Amino acid sequence: MTESRQTRLQVKCPTCQTAVVWKPENAFRPFCSQRCKLIDLGGWADGKYTVSGQTESLPEISEPDMAYR
């Protein structure tokens, strides 16, 4: 892919909707900045975003299983 093609590829920052050039030199892509990247991470931590799917139940652990070996 040529450099001119790479510089034309733009996406919107998921946080602030600013146009962002998609190229390897942009360390924050698809975000425009570290700030927008951290805002998005905070949204995941706060439970604002979820990934749909089925929850798997884990097997019960009894006391003897928890003993140090």
From Swiss-Prot:
Say what the protein does. Inhibits all the catalytic activities of DNA gyrase by preventing its interaction with DNA. Acts by binding directly to the C-terminal domain of GyrB, which probably disrupts DNA binding by the gyrase.
Q: Which Cys pairs are S-S linked?
A: none
User: InterPro entries attached here?
Assistant: DNA_gyrase_inhibitor_YacG, Znf_NHR/GATA
Name of the protein: DNA gyrase inhibitor YacG
So which cofactors does this thing need?
Zn(2+)
Protein family according to the UniProt entry: Belongs to the DNA gyrase inhibitor YacG family.
Question: What keywords appear on the UniProt entry?
Answer: Metal-binding, Zinc
**The organism of origin for this protein:** Neisseria meningitidis serogroup B (strain ATCC BAA-335 / MC58)
Q: Which domain of life is it from?
A: Bacteria
Q: Could you say which residues bind Zn(2+) here?
A: 13, 16, 32, 36
A Pfam family: YacG
A single BP term in Gene Ontology: regulation of DNA-templated transcription
Q: Name one GO molecular function term.
A: zinc ion binding
